[in-house]
């Protein structure tokens, strides 16, 4: 499925999540906008820095799809909250098909923890464009072995480095 195939999206979730149904105008509100997050994930396949900053906030395909996202409360999902934070999604496609997900929790929630590798990958994705790939890789290498190191000072020393220009390795 790709974004061009989607007519509308329905998200069934708990009350508190339904309250996050705005179309964002800045990074802070983008991070908490359920329609925007769903649309960005469908359009771009991810929700990263570029999706929640001006590039994503001004993407007409994301905005149009976000406006087609309907959020509805589900009694069973309300009952599970706050211990669990579920959502179920229906993608209504232009060809008439409806694709429905199971009730799932967001990746990174306590019940759907990120693996160490996913955390390292996210760190690298966020730091390499600012600090450079070499710095990011060296920092990760140092961090992975810090529990056995005699001191954390090498890691702290790396935190005092001035960022390189964007895109520099």
Spans of features found by a protein language model:
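Terminal-appendage/accessory-domain detector
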Residues: 1-169
